Amino acid sequence: MVGDVEQDSPIIPVPCEVVRLAAMPLHKFPVGLWKQLRLREGICSRLPRHYLRSLEEARTPTPVHYRPHGVKFKINPKNGQRERVEDVPIPIYYPPESQLGLWGGEGWILGHRYINNDKLSKRVKKVWKPQLFERELYSEILDTKFTITVTQRTLDLIDEAYGFDFYILKTPKEDLCSKFGMDLKRGMLLRLARQDPQLHPDNPKKRAAIYSKYKEFVIPEAEAEWVGLTLDEAVEKQRLLEEKQQLDSCLPQSDSS
């Protein structure tokens, strides 16, 4: 009878991609939050508040390779309808050598071009790079001349800031895009905070005039020491400070009597 006959169900093949996706573990928190969550545990949570605040309150870099719309809506000239527009930054690659100079926020743009500018021909990869110059720049605060790789945009920004030191001190880290620039800023802020007498030791009037010129940028020395440090450098600095405090607490304290 038909009811006594067992019919095998058809076997449906499962793609390997589905099996791999099913085997992937589910994370408790989104991957995008991992960097922020790292700052809340372990030695990272014991970093100074002003340093953690500088990591959490990262601002949007100033547009360099594209022109923002500046508005959320625009009128379409073809149909007269209001349409939403969005600023989409161009992805920029900052090579390691950009951290050793001052490129003014410029970097490499990775893209494609058509052979002989013919849209019917093959597309090939292309990298657009900024034009670089070697210039000697002088710092009043550090009283030192630096030979730095710069772009024309950097030179224009220095002129707009009315000086090299003003450019370094006024420009946020998101626009400097340079480890060398942040190290310079830390050195300048430390000298301003300490009112270092080694600056023009034979000319106190000139030294006082320089410190007065940049007095608006003075911050406590304890904060200036952390300016421009990467997270790894800050963690190492915090570890050494904690080890020093632990050693000091273990040393016997001599009685003053």
Where in this protein do the model-derived segments appear?
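A positional/structural detector of protein chain ends, strongest at the extreme C-terminus
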Residues: 3-4, 255-257
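N-terminal amphipathic/basic-hydrophobic helices that include classical n-h-c signal peptides
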Residues: 1-21
